[in-house]
From Swiss-Prot:
PANTHER family, per the entry: CELL DIVISION PROTEIN SEPF
Any Pfam family matching the protein: SepF
GO cellular component, one term: cytoplasm
Cellular compartments annotated: Cytoplasm
Protein name in the entry: Cell division protein SepF
Organism encoding this protein: Geobacillus thermodenitrificans (strain NG80-2)
Function: Cell division protein that is part of the divisome complex and is recruited early to the Z-ring. Probably stimulates Z-ring formation, perhaps through the cross-linking of FtsZ protofilaments. Its function overlaps with FtsA.
Family of this protein: Belongs to the SepF family.
Length: 143
């Protein structure tokens, strides 16, 4: 046991001496200074944020041009579509396609004249209504 005691004393004394060397006297804490607040203002000019709204006029001659109109709507531009120079069946297909596009982007489509439609994305609000010629006199029929 003498050997074990010597090892224990040797290791315990060494550990004790290490602790004494690491001990430091307490220092006075520095006074906490208040944080400086930035003098930035969070004001942004509305003119720099708001882009000028655009309205696109479209007069498709073939059904394939409906995709270009849909691209304008996806770019958040309002589109007035004149379908007077296209065959009636193709005009119906274009209106169906644009109705789906407008629904998908959360917009609106309104008929503003005979075969003339206003398609708007969700960022454009339309107020008011336009009555078509003789609309009040006869029962409503699908164009």
């Amino acid at each position: 046991m003498g050997l074990m005691k010597k090892f224990r004393d040797y290791f315990l004394e060494e550990d004790y001496e290490d602790y004494e060397e690491e001990y430091e006297a307490p220092q006075q804490e520095e006074e906490a200074l208040p944080l400086k607040t930035a003098n930035k203002t969070n004001v942004v000019s509305l003119q720099s944020v708001q882009k000028s709204a655009k309205v696109v006029l479209a007069e498709p001659r073939v059904y394939a041009e409906a995709q270009e109109i849909a691209d304008h709507l996806k770019s958040r531009r309002a589109v007035i579509v004149n379908l007077q120079r296209i065959q009636h069946e193709q005009a119906k297909r274009i209106v169906d396609f644009l109705s789906g596009t407008v629904y998908a982007i959360g917009g609106d489509i309104q008929q503003v004249g005979t075969k003339i439609f206003l398609c708007t994305p969700e960022n454009v609000d339309v107020s008011g209504a336009i009555s078509l010629d003789g609309e009040d006199d006869r029962p409503m029929k699908r164009w």
